[in-house]
Structures are given as structure tokens and as C-alpha cells.
Amino acid sequence: MSAQIIAIDAMGGDFGPRSIVQASIACLSATPSLHLTLVGQPSLLEDLVSGLAAADRARLQIVAASEVIGMDERPSQALRGKPDSSMRIALELVRDGKAQACVSAGNTGALMALSRFVLKTLPGIDRPAMVAAIPTQAGYCQLLDLGANVDCSAENLYQFAVMGSVAAQALGVHRPRVALLNIGTEDIKGNQQVKLAASLLQNARGLNYVGFVEGDGLYRGEADVVVCDGFVGNILLKSSEGLATMIGARIEQLFKGGVLSRAAGAVAMPLLKRLQADLAPARHNGASFLGLQGIVIKSHGSAGVQGFQSAIQRALIEIQENLPQRLHGRLEDLLL
């Protein structure tokens, strides 16, 4: 297998580089074809990788960056005021062909602005969209947009549907069912932009558009790709993650009661732990910026080691599936 090279913004996120480097080391050990470039403060990063086995260290490079983009900085400030930030340099490595993907846990707005500036969008795409896998009764669906575009036109939603369908196919879904997230399934429901997007999708060639889906239908697995604006999508994503965490915590509390509760817990806990692990936000961490001329994966800023590993794994899949090129090849046929 040919090598996969990923640039890591090692200074992004809420907790600094330690968990990012630990996740990177774990991925290197698990994937012999993986090469990583950590971008950030060299002295700090060298200390964190000092115990790495020689074979793995040979597949890890450190590139210096003198600036870090804060989680609360305005995208315009990051774009104009920090040309030597770890985030920007990681993206430039992708642009220059020195890496095949960039993974960052940094400021979402800054990452989107820099990605559009450094990598540019694919021809025909007005705005990139953030997409991630959401667990459902039937497996997973791809949900987009997750916050990159708070206000969207009908044409934006149409483009998101096209990109989401191609991404789902790249992940192994044959003829993915595409739906618009709405407050009802009837044609009269929804705001003007959603209704207009529905009319565009109904006439689209090569898309398996199945209509509107409500929030409960999403979790029942009624669609493989669910499209909404970034305001709705971000709220849905974070509510889902919070609910999954709360359910796991409540289950553990219930089985810590009396003798009968503990006995029942001893029997049921292995299965419940499997369910909890399947729904855990860390397992599904890593949102892809679709529509760029390069692969960019956004990790949660609060992600720990397991979560950041998941983001790197998503980047690996998109490299292996050559996702930007596949998107480019399909867009000419599907876009308006």
C-alpha cells in the first residue's frame, strides 16, 4: 500500500498538543503506511515524541510554526494577521503536495476561512460544507452542514446534497438516499429555502432524493445523507452528542443502586458498554470539509486521544478513496 501523508495542526484545540501527539503516535503504530507531519512549536513537540520507537519516528516529521490561532479569534484576524500559524502551515503543506490531508482541532471559523483561501473550492461549489457520520438504527448517515454555513440558499443546500451523496458512495453506500431535514415530511412544511431546495433535488439527475426527513426519522435510518443549514446541523450534532453522553451516565447510575440493581448491571453491563462505546462522540469525531481542492478534517476542540484518532482515521479513509477527485469527477454531471 502506498504511503498516506497527513499534516497535523498540533497546536490547535482546547488542551494543547499533548493529546494530539498521543493520538498521532497511536495512529502511526497502528498504520504502517501512515506518515505524519506535526506542525507547531518544535521544542515542545520533540519532547512529546521523544519516546517514540525508531521505526515510527522515521515516519513522523516536525515542521516549525511560530504562531497559534486562538479558539476565540476572528477568522479575519487569523487570515490576515497570522501567516505563520500552525493551522495555516498545515494547510499549505496540502496545497503544495507535501501532505494529502490536514487534521485540526482548532478554531472552526478560522479553519474554514483559511481552507478556502489556501486550498480553494472545487469548480462549481460556492461554499464548502462540514459533514460527519451520525449513528442511526440502520448504521450511519452523513449529516451536513454542521456549522460552516449558518445561512444557506436553496442552491447551497442542493450543492451540499450532491457532495454528501458522493461522499456516502465513497464510504461504501450504494445509491445513497438523500433527504432534507425538515419539521415535517409533507410538501407544505418548511421554510422557503428548504422548499426551493426540495424542488431542485426532485429534478436532479443521478441523485436518489427521498424527500423530507424529520429528526426522529434521521435516527431511524430513513436516509443515508441528511442535508440542512449549518445552524440547524450544529445544534442537532451537539444535542445528539450530549444525549449520548447523558444516556451512558444515567445507565451507569441506575446499576449502582441496591443489590438487585448491581446484580442486573453485572449481567447487562457488557452489552450496555458496547452500546455506549458505539454511541460515544469520540468514536464519530472528525468532520470533513467537503467541496475543497484538498482534504481537511475538523476535530472537536475538546477531543481527547480517542477522539483525535477518529479524526485521523477519517482523513485516512478520504485519502484512500481519493475523495476530492471523486467529487470533482461527479460535480459536472450533478450541479445545476
From Swiss-Prot:
Gene Ontology biological process terms in this record: fatty acid biosynthetic process; phospholipid biosynthetic process
Record's signal peptide: none
Annotated compartments: Cytoplasm
InterPro entries named in the record: FA_synthesis, Phospholipid_synth_PlsX-like
GO cellular component, one term: cytoplasm
Domain of life assignment: Bacteria
SUPFAM superfamilies in alphabetical order: Isocitrate/Isopropylmalate dehydrogenase-like
Pfam families: FA_synthesis (PF02504)
Catalysed reactions, semicolon-separated: a fatty acyl-[ACP] + phosphate = an acyl phosphate + holo-[ACP]
EC number: 2.3.1.274
Gene3D superfamilies assigned to the protein according to its UniProt record, in alphabetical order: Isopropylmalate Dehydrogenase
Keywords: Cytoplasm, Lipid biosynthesis, Lipid metabolism, Phospholipid biosynthesis, Phospholipid metabolism, Transferase
Subunit structure, as described in the record: Homodimer. Probably interacts with PlsY.
Its job: Catalyzes the reversible formation of acyl-phosphate (acyl-PO(4)) from acyl-[acyl-carrier-protein] (acyl-ACP). This enzyme utilizes acyl-ACP as fatty acyl donor, but not acyl-CoA.
Protein name (record): Phosphate acyltransferase
UniProt organism field: Pseudomonas putida (strain GB-1)
Name of the gene this protein is made from: plsX
